[in-house]
Amino acid sequence: MKKIIGIGVSDGIAVAKAFIIQTPQFDVKKYTNVKMTPTQAKKLLSSAFQKAKKDLEEIKTITVKNINQEAGMIFDAHIQILNDPTITEQLEQQLNKNIHPVIAVDNVFQQTALMFSEMDDKYFKERASDILDLHQRLLSYLTGVKLNDLIRIKSDVIIVANDLTPSQTATLNKKYVKGFLTESGGKTSHAAIMARSMEIPAIVGLKNITSKVEDGKTVGINGRKGIVGFDFSSKDITQWKQEKELESNFQNELKQYTNKLVKTLDGYEVIVASNIGNVKDMDLAVEYNTNGIGLFRTEFLYMSSQDWPDESVQFEAYKTVLQKAKNDLVIIRTLDIGGDKKLNYFQFPHEDNPFLGYRAIRLTLDKQAVFKTQLRALLRASDYGNLGIMFPMVATLDELVQVKQLLTKVQQEFNETKKFKLGIMIEIPSAALAADCLGKHVDFFSIGSNDLIQYSFAADRMNKNVSYLYQPLNPALLRLIKLVVEGGKLNNVWTGMCGEMASDQYAIPLLLGLGLTELSMSASSMFKARMVIAKITINECKSLVEKALKLTSDSAVRKLVENFFKKKNIFI
């Protein structure tokens, strides 16, 4: 048997025949010399848009019926993209230049997808697949090239593809499709979300998988471990089927951990909250019984607008999430734009190192009118729930003092008394080292582990050449986190975490041992986190982290935790 390792995005084990899907090919260049008046072009494009919207409504209905309401809402987002003035205006500009609709659609949607794919934030990065899904659909109507018809599958298969669009995933028949393998995609892509909703295993990030696996041959997929097996012997198939039974038992056990409140065996309560990227994500978080929102990214409000969103638009979004959370804490991060997150209506200055430049709190302190609008919306929304306001990318005490002064000024304009908790993201080493000073001015810290790791090891986590330096369990990072927690405790400030490390099951006992009281993650990760927490004691965690801090490498710490889990019979 041969094995390939990828990124598991939906748990489960399956063994079935490979069904390879080829990406549709559109010969866009042949339309370069096809003449059409702007009026004719607009009529043709309008027809394609109407067909797309009709199809998406039908796919949504099927998805809600076969999967759930939340999965269906993905296609509301697709329809919103088609109605986005930025997209429609760019297309109209091209048509007015006598560019054929096929070429115009290809230009605009490819450029938009590229913009998202180059973003560092995984949530926004993976929206590129949604744009490309619509790109394929529109080109299909305009050129007559048919899309892959997955409804015709009538036997047990594992789909193998370069990528699966959300609309393709929605039409998969769970009776026959036992899992899928793709070259592209990530944990927060809509196709991955759909797979989890359908409860079928899925693995992404499998380079050249369509050429390594033979169509019609037996393949195995272990979604939790990210393992693909092929070229099976009969013994291999028997072994995989046995593992499938164990996996099924594990998944059934996970379903026991639905309670919002979770404690360690010795009664230490841990807040397991959810990260969301927009208002609709809140519904899935509520379905998974989240204990509040540890990170609400507000960038979507700005990136989906034609201009800086006004106070009323922001207020409605914040109010809705706060109301859905009832009285649970909702931490809303102020605008974190810049770096790889750009706006169509704002020209960022050229920078050699944009990730270390004009972004997040540095930008909003400079553009105070924009910042005040957001702060006013947040203050108004604070009447509707338990609000936490969090400032990103704070590097120095001076920055924090400046931003607090601005917030106080806005409060005075409102004549408002404080109805919120105030915190900062700790994602820059200078802030971690100064936590004792910063803690005097806030109510909470939330460690942004993704950037803290990146800046601590001077390694771009999206750069494959240095990805080996993404080491969340490295003792150096654990020591930095320890400083943050201790600095907070000196000022009665609690510390949580909202980066990917918070959902890393190997990291959880270490984080609890260091003193974190809140872990925020994607909704789908919460069951596993609750399970780990419920099977350990806080004293065990403290003892474990003491040992970890004496080690010298990420791999050594990982082995330490692995042995701890074995002794505790924790199956992950």
Swiss-Prot record:
Entry binding sites for Mg(2+): 427, 451
Chief place of localization: cytoplasm
Localization, UniProt: Cytoplasm
Cofactor or coenzyme needed: Mg(2+)
Keywords: Cytoplasm, Kinase, Magnesium, Metal-binding, Phosphotransferase system, Sugar transport, Transferase, Transport
GO BP terms: N-acetylglucosamine transport; phosphoenolpyruvate-dependent sugar phosphotransferase system
Function: General (non sugar-specific) component of the phosphoenolpyruvate-dependent sugar phosphotransferase system (sugar PTS). This major carbohydrate active-transport system catalyzes the phosphorylation of incoming sugar substrates concomitantly with their translocation across the cell membrane. Enzyme I transfers the phosphoryl group from phosphoenolpyruvate (PEP) to the phosphoryl carrier protein (HPr).
Protein name: Phosphoenolpyruvate-protein phosphotransferase
Lineage: Bacteria, Bacillati, Mycoplasmatota, Mycoplasmoidales, Mycoplasmoidaceae
